[in-house]
A protein has these predicted regions:
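The feature captures the conserved acid-bearing segment of alpha/beta-hydrolase catalytic domains
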Residues: 1-63
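Alpha/beta-hydrolase-fold serine-hydrolase catalytic core, especially in secreted/extracellular enzymes
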Residues: 60-128
Length: 128
């Protein structure tokens, strides 16, 4: 299960408190803001997952960096809805991480799919 900067607030507590039994990877911005409960719910969900789980928070990114918006228009930068990491490399690098995660858990291809991303982008990674 892969989640790109998804919102956990509307997810019912039964799911948050049970977690899931399949591998899980969350990749997203460093913060949703000081009043958001999103990461509190994500952390509880992560703790309750019953398989490998990752939380990758990338500093200087925003929600729309995890979409195709940077390819479509430079308007995101002007409106300040894209972070500083938005550039022509971020989406391809993000795609490599996504592909690496799925290759590991669907094809048993055990290459280190986080290492290059971690070297290039200021990020925090939580794994269990």
């Amino acid at each position: 299960c892969l989640n790109l900067d998804g919102w956990f607030v509307p997810i019912v507590d039964d799911i948050i408190n049970t977690g899931i039994k399949i591998p899980f990877c969350y990749i997203g911005q460093e913060s949703w803001g000081p009043k958001s409960k999103n990461y509190s719910k994500l952390n509880t969900f992560f703790d309750n997952c019953q398989n490998d789980a990752y939380i990758i928070k990338v500093k200087q990114t925003k929600h729309f960096d995890y979409s195709d918006l940077p390819y479509i228009s430079s308007l995101g930068k002007k409106l300040k809805i894209n972070g500083k990491a938005s550039n022509k490399d971020f989406i391809p690098d993000l795609n490599k991480v996504i592909l690496g995660f799925f290759n590991e858990y669907l094809k048993n291809d055990l290459k280190d799919w986080i290492e290059d991303f971690e070297k290039k982008y200021d990020s925090t990674i939580k794994f269990k």
